[in-house]
């Protein structure tokens, strides 16, 4: 079975952790591909350029200047750094975005009303991806050549417009399109019931528990899109979704998501 691994959070900023993750990723049995974010670095670059990052419910509002920044950071530095590191460890990785070979197309996200029922947000140049937007023939051909795709979260609308897409959405859509298992790796051991206690990992979360965790504020910020995409992946036929630490890719543990 194919495994789609998504890496994000602060892992990309931790050289030692990233190095261990890449070694474990290479050792992971079976066919696999990698999807990555890069939001922390993108935020730093924005601030250095005098652009204030705007986040709403864990998702980045992307105006024209922000789009330039995230494209440079995600498809440039982050993607090529990961590919170079994997290549140095003997993994024949190839860096890709959704624009390459038109393999992932996105639709501009329409303005949305937030959970409060009042606030309307225009996310700007942000794209939504569906499993039907993935060119599975292209992805399978790349995998069949013995290459390991490393996808950034920059896609396009097919008409020349670049779009910023949440990396968790890209990973869940690719997994659904390929019928692959999905493993989302970040700096925590899993979803925590107490953010100040790294050992408070919730082993299983179903839909009802997710709603309870949202209502209590236990799950908020960047964890919201992670879990929303995890449940979307399961509803679209992904056989298994696990959220876990990047340092424990090959071990048991983490949080298993169930419908």
Per-region residue spans from a language model:
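C-terminal catalytic "cap/lid" subdomain
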Residues: 1-259
């Amino acid at each position: 079975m194919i495994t789609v691994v998504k890496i994000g959070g602060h892992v990309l900023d931790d050289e030692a952790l990233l190095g261990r993750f890449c070694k474990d990723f290479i050792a992971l049995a079976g066919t696999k591909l990698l999807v990555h974010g890069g939001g922390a670095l993108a935020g730093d670059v924005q601030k250095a350029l005098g652009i204030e990052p705007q986040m709403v419910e864990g998702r980045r509002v992307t105006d024209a200047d922000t789009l330039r920044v995230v494209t440079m950071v995600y498809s440039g530095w982050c993607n090529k750094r990961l590919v170079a590191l994997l290549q140095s460890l003997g993994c024949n990785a190839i860096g890709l975005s959704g624009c390459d070979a038109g393999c992932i197309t996105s639709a501009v996200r329409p303005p949305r009303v937030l959970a409060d029922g009042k606030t309307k947000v225009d996310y700007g140049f942000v794209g939504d991806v569906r499993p039907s937007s993935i060119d599975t023939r292209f992805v399978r051909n790349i995998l069949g050549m013995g290459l390991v795709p490393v996808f950034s979260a920059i896609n396009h609308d097919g008409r020349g417009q670049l779009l910023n897409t949440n990396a968790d959405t890209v990973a869940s859509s690719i997994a659904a399109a390929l019928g692959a298992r999905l493993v989302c790796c970040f700096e925590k051991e899993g979803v925590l019931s107490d953010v100040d206690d790294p050992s408070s990992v919730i082993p299983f979360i179903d839909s009802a528990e997710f709603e309870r965790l949202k209502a209590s504020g236990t799950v908020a910020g960047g964890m919201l899109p992670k879990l929303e995409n995890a449940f979307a992946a399961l509803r679209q036929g992904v056989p298994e979704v696990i959220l876990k630490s990047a340092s424990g890719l090959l071990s048991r543990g983490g949080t298993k998501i169930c419908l």
